[in-house]
């Protein structure tokens, strides 16, 4: 009798653990697993009244290399053969 009670408890615990691990959280604009689609992100930004989607500026190669100049000096100091 003790073995059957123990088995029932184990099955119930297994079922509860399986339910918690397999359940998904759903909220407005979110896909299962906490992922967002690009369209939903755009809709959320518009919903927040930011005036639309903010475009990131494209960096020119000169500006980019200028930003990396301190790192280039460090690399030349520590790796003179390159």
From Swiss-Prot:
Residues recorded with modification Pyrrolidone carboxylic acid: 24
Tell me which residues bear Glycine amide: 33
GO MF, one example: gonadotropin-releasing hormone receptor binding
Q: Which InterPro entries match?
A: GnRH, Gonadoliberin
The record's keywords, sorted A to Z, are:
Amidation, Cleavage on pair of basic residues, Hormone, Pyrrolidone carboxylic acid, Secreted, Signal
Q: Where in the cell is it found?
A: Secreted
Annotated coiled-coil positions are none
Q: Which GO terms describe its cellular component?
A: extracellular space
Q: Does the keyword Protease apply?
A: no
Main location, first listed in the record: secreted
Signal sequence coordinates: 1-23
Keyword Signal set for record: yes
According to its UniProt entry, the function of this protein is described as: Stimulates the secretion of gonadotropins.
Q: State the similarity comment.
A: Belongs to the GnRH family.
Q: What is this protein called?
A: Progonadoliberin-3
- Which species does this protein come from? Salmo trutta (Brown trout)
Tell me what gene encodes this: gnrh3
